[in-house]
Amino acid sequence: MSSSVDFVTEQGRCGDDGNGAGETVKNGEIDHLLSEPSAPTISLPTESFLRAATLLKNQVVEATWKGGVEALASGSGPVLDPTVYTGLLGTAFTCLKSYEVTRNHQDLLTCAEIIDTCANVARATTRHVTFLCGRGGVCTLGAIVANYRGDQSKRDFFLGLFLELAEERELPAGPEEGGFGMSYDLLYGRAGFLWAALFLNRYLGQGTVPDHLLSPIVAAILAGGRVGAADHEACPLLYRFHGTRFWGAANGLAGILYVLLHFPLSEEDVKDVQGTLRYMMSNRFPNSGNYPCSEGNPRDKLVQWAHGATGMAITLAKASQVFPKERDFREAAIEAGEVVWKSGLVKKVGLADGVAGNAYAFLSLYRLTGDVVYEERAKAFASYLCRDAIELVNMTSQETEHDYSLFRGLAGPVCLWFDLVSPVDSKFPGYEI
């Protein structure tokens, strides 16, 4: 029996601490998968992940799109959230992931319908330009899905909208131009817009969003980081989000650096990016090896993508690929993965702060190293979710409108299960390019 099997068996089901024990919420179809002969081995076969993903994807669509839109139309539901992160556009992303694995054209049709609805809402309600939490997500997914469907007119329409976003004056404005109105982070700021551009170029071809639009934004992010670190001798780049110097992937250094690593960097830029990563590596918590949530924060509690070792593991894995001669990045990525293995089986399910996001750290390390132990660990976490995802949501949820969302709910495990059909091709949704 592999170490991944031993670990999950020892952890047991959520609720063993008395917090919700005996209150299991049954899901007949998905629970049926666990009655297979392979279930006692904990790590389920690929076919089971695919079936579980398809079943739960259908539930996500029913809850957020079919039933959800009806509730909105009747006035009985919440205001439509048109974002990838917690909103309806996350369902579109999930359907796109399903289509790419199964080639079910109904998924592509559903995705296109959702995007059209979100486009109408986002135009009036969303001021941000990022992929995860802004209009960049609508434009990007709209162009990609239209391209898959062979709809050149709609593809060009959404691409045109994205290029209009690129003209936002604050995007390339550095500190010397007074560019402090827009943040630098992945969720709401400049890095989040650049991520959307990288995603578009991946699907539609390099140069779809041209370098002359992106390079000034990269320069503005680097300049802002240097100004932010002007009073800090040890760290070359620092950024504030609502006054706090976050380190994590969502609003902090890990996410910003991950995006910067995809662009051509000058010798000075490389020195500052590497120096910032090494500053973070040298200031890990000495006992656990975990990373602080923010500069100077002494609390060692969170192991997740948004804050802590998970996001850093993925960013360091990328740094190792970009700088293969710098062996310390590879070693630090592996060490961060060990933190996730020891402490990452948490009581939430989503990509941002739950087990699904933590499993992606192992998939990133699997692609980096080729070591099957990381594939086994990802499957162990994913198998735990097959058993307990819906129960975990019911135990921990205080925001029912996010229960099926991509980053805080059940759509996250769906994407993870689909990615386990071909782990070598896996990508953390909205983070890895």
Swiss-Prot record:
Residues 1-22 are annotated as: Disordered. This is LanC-like protein GCL1. One of its GO terms (biological process) is peptide modification. Pfam families: LANC_like (PF05147). InterPro entries: 6hp_glycosidase-like_sf, LANC-like, LanC-like_prot_euk. The lineage of its organism: Eukaryota, Viridiplantae, Streptophyta, Embryophyta, Tracheophyta. Belongs to the LanC-like protein family. Signal peptide: none annotated. It comes from the Eukaryota. Disruption phenotype: No visible phenotype under normal growth conditions. It comes from Arabidopsis thaliana. GO terms for cellular component: extrinsic component of membrane. May play a role in signaling. May be not involved in abscisic acid (ABA) signaling.
